[in-house]
UniProtKB/Swiss-Prot annotation:
Lineage: Viruses, Varidnaviria, Bamfordvirae, Preplasmiviricota, Tectiliviricetes
Alphabetical list of PROSITE patterns matching this protein: BCL2_FAMILY (PS50062)
Keyword Hydrolase among record annotations: no
Protein name: E1B protein, small T-antigen
Keyword entries, A-Z: Early protein, Host-virus interaction, Inhibition of host apoptosis by viral BCL2-like protein, Modulation of host cell apoptosis by virus
Swiss-Prot/TrEMBL GO biological process terms: symbiont-mediated suppression of host apoptosis
Membrane-spanning segments: none
Species, as recorded: Canine adenovirus serotype 2 (CAdV-2)
């Protein structure tokens, strides 16, 4: 169950990469369609993202000094991004793009490495959400099947026993 159709890491990476670019022809036609959607969400939600992670937050200092893996895992886990308009996954993609767009320019991390340093833990988080949703769906389906088969058995027993309320079968 993957409503965003993120089949693999390369697709995910291309969407994040495209969403960091300015709106226009290049982003719209050279990257997956979701990149343009995510890029537009970043623009719309930028104020809210700055409230979640203000400019004076210690996270930006960690990025500046090159500490990325532990800090990303902490931010990704702690941030409550979804709201009534955005699903958790879309808000998450937009937040990742926001982080890349606002990465401190004086960071020790080379610009070429930033995308993968952000996308790898983000992709792992997305996979966990997808697998969890799939497990919940499978569990709900099996519960519904069990309830349905139990009701069918009760109906069969009632018909065989002749104690049905239906006048034709009574």
């Amino acid at each position: 169950m993957d409503p965003l159709k993120l089949e693999n890491y390369l697709t995910f990476r291309a969407i994040i990469r495209g969403s960091t670019l300015s709106p226009g022809f290049f982003r719209r036609w050279c990257f997956p369609a979701l990149a343009d959607v995510v890029g537009n969400i970043v623009v719309q939600e930028e104020g809210r993202f700055w409230q979640i992670l203000p400019e004076n937050h210690a996270f930006w200092g960690l990025l500046r000094r090159g500490f990325t893996v532990a800090s990303f895992t902490e931010i990704i886990t702690a941030a409550q991004l979804e709201n009534e308009r955005l699903s958790r996954q879309l808000a998450f993609l937009a937040f990742i793009s926001f982080l890349l767009r606002n990465w401190p320019s004086d960071s020790l991390v080379p610009e070429a490495d930033r995308l993968d340093l952000v996308c790898a833990p983000a992709w792992s988080r997305m996979q966990i959400w997808t697998q969890t949703a799939r497990l919940i769906n499978d569990l709900q389906d099996s519960v519904l099947e069990e309830q349905g088969s139990a009701e069918e058995e009760e109906c069969e027993e009632a018909l065989l026993a002749g104690d049905s309320d239906d006048p034709l079968f009574g």
